[in-house]
Amino acid sequence: MGNSVTHTGAIAASGGTIRLLGDRVSLLDQASLDVSSPNGGGTVLVGGDYQGRATVPVAQVTTVGPDTTIRADALSSGNGGEIIVWAAETANIHGILTARGGAIAGNGGLIETSGRQTLNLTATVEAGAPGGVGNVGGLWLIDPETFLLLPLAVALLAAVMLT
């Protein structure tokens, strides 16, 4: 492919789809991608599609900076959307990613953070279902070839799982 995409601004597509694809994809500074809508979240693809499927071009390196936000929330009723951040080699994923179900009703969405060879992950991720009884939380798929948890991350993960 040989092309690079760097985004530092804001893109909004209420309930729609945003695709940032290329050989190297970077979301930097205070970049914002938002496909949230009142009745359900849309889809954001950064660097590839679900589990690296060849339906779209796949990035070798994907970076989501620490001040970046990616949102695919249902704002009122409806299900959270889908956020895929993917790289065939290295994914550096920081910032905030949300695919929440609606405040009144709706299930959480899907968030995938994957680097086939290397995944550097410090992102805040939320795919919950805050509204109504019987709503189901979403899915966070973490899919590197090798997964390393540092001691602080293990302690934080344990604390979250106990609450």
List each language-model region with its residue ranges.
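Extracellular and secretory-pathway beta-repeat/beta-biased strand scaffolds
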Residues: M1-T163
